Amino acid sequence: MFDYSQYEKAPLIETKDYRAPKNGNVFFYNTLDKKKIRVGVWYPIGFKENSSSRGTIFLQQGHNEFIEKYFEVIQEFLNRKFIVICFDWRGQGMSDRMIDNENKAYIKSFNMHDNDLNEILSNIIEPYLSKPLIGIGHSM
């Protein structure tokens, strides 16, 4: 199982009526170029490693979106016994920005997103989360 203790815990924004799914870990993953990417991983209630998951949903948000927008979607997949992982793209949500203006989602090249995606796949998903891996994306 993935060791979350080696990473800085990251916050989620909730309201009284819009709560994060339970049984999750949200943290900042440090990329090779020293940027923080906010990542969330949720496990179905009662999950036991290698026994009670149907696989992993890799949920990839659209442009200018963030983890919190997908709480209901995450919960639907958890109810169906999938593990769910998602992250805020570089420059979005609570991930690091490439420029000083926190209100702008600028990246120099889309390759930066590709690199972040590949790091998360290689260092978190492939070695630690249940197969099969099912990718779901929106608007990128």
For each predicted feature, which ranges?
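Conserved alpha/beta-hydrolase
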Residues: 67, 72-99
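An N-terminal hydrophobic leader/cap segment in hydrolases
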Residues: 1-30, 37-45, 49
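Active-site glycine-rich loops that stabilize anionic/oxyanionic intermediates
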Residues: 54-65, 140
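Donor nucleotide-sugar binding loop of glycosyltransferases
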Residues: 35, 66
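Alpha/beta-hydrolase active-site loop
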Residues: 105-127
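Alpha/beta-hydrolase fold nucleophile elbow
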Residues: 128-139
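Short coil/turn segments at beta-strand junctions that form active-site/ligand-binding loops
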Residues: 54-55, 81-82, 130-132
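Conserved Rossmann-like nucleotide-binding pocket used by diverse enzymes
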Residues: 59, 85, 136
